[in-house]
Amino acid sequence: MEYRLRLFWGRPSGTLILRIWEVVIMKREGQISVNSKNMFPIIKKWLYSDKDIFLREIVSNSCDAIKKLSSLRGIGQAPQEDGWQPKVIVTIDSEKKQLIVSDNGIGMTEDEVERYITQVAFSGAEEFLEKYREKSEESAGIIGHFGLGFYSAFMVSSTVEIETLSYQEGAKPVHWVSAGEDSYEIEDGTRTEHGTTIIMNISEEEQEFLQESRIREILNKYCQFMPYEIYLNPHDEERPVYDKDGNVEKNEDGTDKTRIVKPLPVNDTHPLWLKAPKDCTDEEYKAFYQKVFMDFNEPLFWIHLNVDYPFNLKGILYFPKQTNKLEVVPGQVKLFSNQVFVADNIKEIIPEFLLLLKGVIDCPDMPLNVSRSFLQNDGEVQKIAQHITKKVSDKLHQIFKNERENYEKYWNDISAFIKFGCLKDEKFYDRMKDIILLKTIDGEYKTLEEYPKTDENKIYYVTDENLQAQYIAMFRENGLTAAVLTHMIDPHFISLLEYKNPDQLKFLRIDSDLGDALKVDQSEDAKKAGEEQSKELIDCFKTYLGDEKLEYQVESLKAVGTPAVILLSEYARRVQDMTRALGESFAGQNQVTLVINSENPVVQSIPTLPKEDQELVCRHIYDLAMLAHRPLSAEQMQAFVARNVKILELLTKQESK
């Protein structure tokens, strides 16, 4: 007699009744400590924003089943099979509204279905419910959501079926079906070859998972590098055969000659990071970069990670070109576990500053079904992060030592990454401090040790080469240099350098201070003789400008062609920048100094001009100095243009006379 079995869960007594359609054979006793009805709504709610992850779980299980069979054959515990080609096939049946995942792996017996699909899954439900009962979607925080396994299929399915046949000799096929509540049915199946087929009857609200483009997108996201071939809706395709001239070749009977094209897998089972670095070419590295990140700008260089001890870690990190020089363009570091995609940019594993790079890291030893807070405090995880950081710094040192010219070429692209790393990681700063470069206004690159400093260890810097062009010209005329620090991260970085080198470095913006090298050497007698002229000039500017917050200073500058410059102290500027970043106003933002150049012919002529012309010249000199310091307001610009017109009128009248 053939017996068809049906099992029912969750009776009030806690017992498990096994019924036969024709005769009741036995009664199995067992305690189910969790109501399985509660499990599936929580799964669906917990992973609401990541529903597509179900396909990764199902396909991963298929790959595991293939790997188990392959391992058993390798040790002689399973019979060999000629022509066996391990593969996973994903099929969409739009009419039946089914998504089907099938493998030719180890398969399961009826006992194994009960043990692995039912008992194991449901017995793990208590821990699952306890862990996530109180957690919202935002705070769930499980890395990669691994561990849901087979039951993740219920996130998108009204019912799920299993057709399976074990590799074991004499095994019978098994069919299992459940609607994800408190019961399931199990009976003889129809499968004829070893392996497992998961049939997901997609629910009405999840019909997007019956679109081939959507499934292909998910497979490309999660399964792009899984270790066994994966096919989506595979079928042989008949294509015409063309000759060398591009014409379709003909058969003897005059019909078009065709050929059968076999389907191609959607994944790459041997990703580049698994190869030894010595076996990889530059072309392969570049092609892999373009394939994974769809970035057709060539990377600057890359680091191939290949570690077997004390932990298993493989991967490739690329340094991309930064197309936006003012801002850091975020990178993308993909984390894998045994070639299965987990997530992008997990800063608990990959140091935050490395996320400016692009790359892949495969770490089978990483615990992925734990919380982010656990990862933050896990010693092994911290060792992995530190190792990755060390490998990056070693590579940069290698390029600096052996390819200094290339390192300088790369600097504009990698400087933001290095500076950010130094700010975030003190050990990284200690490794990198000797190869940090400063670019000068003359286009040279110097380390901090090589950079020419003043007697007071001052380093002048530029934040805008166009706006500060007048100051740059003054420096160049006098044989001085300044560092070009135009990136948004630079203010924070120079503060770090000053903190790390309190007695050796002091950064001053080029318009914050006038060093002695910019001034004319004068004897004490000459200085005293010029004091009266200086007082007269200051009184004149004070009278006509009428700005009580403005400070005045007269200096003899070597740049004779410059009538005046504006200075704002480095301290005042930094406070100003800080308060602006906090959205507050800085009371001292107008406390600037107008430095009047007593060597300039126009300035020297001011005391001899008529009163009305004195005001015009003083205001115009101030506007010119302010323009070189910062943009004028709309009102200031309007007044500046009006004075320009008046000056032109005076010149034309003078010419006509």
Describe the residue ranges of each PLM region.
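GHKL/Bergerat-fold ATPase module in large chromosome/replication-associated machines
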Residues: 142, 160-183, 203-207, 213-657
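GHKL (Bergerat-fold) ATPase N-terminal catalytic module, capturing the glycine-rich phosphate-binding loop
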Residues: 8-10, 15-210, 217, 224, ...
